[in-house]
């Protein structure tokens, strides 16, 4: 983690878990996970990157087909391992929003980047990570080893369910930009803690609040923004909004666009995703 580099030396690297999404009430299994969703968005927009992740040998064709169809750069030798893929059970509630439970780490239990993955990260100008526990451990390890020096690092803290202020600060020491999809009110003490970390460490923290807008704590520039959004009818679900938002924001920023322009692109991308019943449109699968 170091000074911001908006034009990657060798493209960006995307690092995070992918999983088997088991739609229980439909008897359907689809490739999923925040990193895979991000990869689809970046591939669609033409943003150059390499995906670092791992799946097991239980459903390799499901993932291989997705990667090939969408021309997602990856190392097959590192991506496809042995054992069970990570998985999660999804049930669609009456309000059409997904309820997720029974996450199984599979090949991510005890995960460690191989030498190729470490080299890819060490050589990249930009790195985005989707934080589940095994990824958090690796970011701390490689950050403390100096492998993030010179890279612009961003991280998706998801809905902050497994974090508190101290743990957030420990991870943000290795990160330049943090994203939090906060499900509560903007006045909650947790949000105040996000602000303290951003300004205490001189980091950028972007908090999405759904129809309540976006909070930006720019500890680097010593400013904060409250960005309103226009509430729109949700025709599908909101499950894919966060990935769409972050993908659009980062591709804009890392191509040299300003903060406000990137936020507007991200807002529009997040709104588009509310028309989908899954994290991605049906045709993506």
Model regions and ranges:
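Ribokinase/PfkB-type carbohydrate-kinase core domain
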Residues: 2-14, 65-69, 74-79, 92-224, ...
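Conserved phosphate-binding/catalytic region of the ribokinase-like
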Residues: 2-8, 191-285
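Substrate-binding N-lobe of the ribokinase-like
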Residues: 8-11, 15, 20-88, 94-95, ...
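Acidic active-site catalytic centers that drive phospho-/nucleotidyl reactions
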Residues: 17, 21, 156, 237, ...
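A short, flexible beta-alpha/helix-coil linker loop
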Residues: 19-23, 160, 232-234
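Generic secondary-structure signature for well-ordered alpha-helical cores
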Residues: 20, 44-47, 72, 180, ...
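Residue-level marker of alpha-helix boundaries and capping positions
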Residues: 29, 54-55, 133, 240, ...
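Short secondary-structure boundary/hinge segments and terminal tails
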Residues: 59-61, 84-86, 164, 215-216, ...
């Amino acid at each position: 983690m170091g000074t911001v580099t908006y034009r990657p030396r060798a493209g960006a690297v995307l690092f995070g878990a992918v999983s088997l999404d088991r739609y229980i009430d439909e008897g359907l299994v689809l490739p999923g996970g925040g990193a895979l969703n991000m990869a689809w968005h970046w591939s669609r927009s033409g943003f150059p990157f390499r995906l670092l992740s791992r799946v097991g040998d239980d459903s390799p064709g499901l993932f291989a087909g997705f990667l090939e169809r969408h021309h997602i750069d990856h190392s097959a030798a590192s991506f496809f391992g042995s054992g069970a893929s990570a998985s999660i059970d999804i049930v669609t509630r009456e309000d059409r929003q997904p309820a997720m439970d029974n996450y199984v780490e599979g090949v991510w239990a005890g995960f460690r980047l191989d030498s190729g993955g470490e080299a890819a990260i060490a050589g990249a100008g930009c790195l985005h990570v989707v934080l589940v526990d095994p990824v958090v451990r690796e970011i701390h390890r490689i950050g403390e080893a100096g492998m993030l020096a010179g890279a612009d690092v961003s991280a998706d803290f998801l809905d902050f369910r497994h974090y508190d202020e101290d743990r957030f600060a420990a991870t943000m020491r290795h990160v330049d930009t943090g994203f939090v999809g906060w499900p509560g009110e903007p006045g909650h003490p947790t949000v105040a803690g996000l602000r303290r970390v951003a300004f205490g460490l001189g980091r950028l923290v972007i908090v999405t609040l759904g129809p309540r807008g976006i909070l930006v704590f720019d500890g680097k520039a010593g400013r904060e923004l409250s960005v309103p959004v226009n509430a729109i009818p949700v025709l599908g679900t909101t499950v894919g909004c966060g990935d769409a938002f972050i993908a659009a924001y980062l591709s804009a920023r890392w191509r040299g666009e300003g903060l406000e322009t990137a936020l507007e692109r991200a807002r529009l991308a997040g709104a588009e995703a509310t028309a989908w019943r899954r994290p991605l449109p049906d045709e993506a699968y």
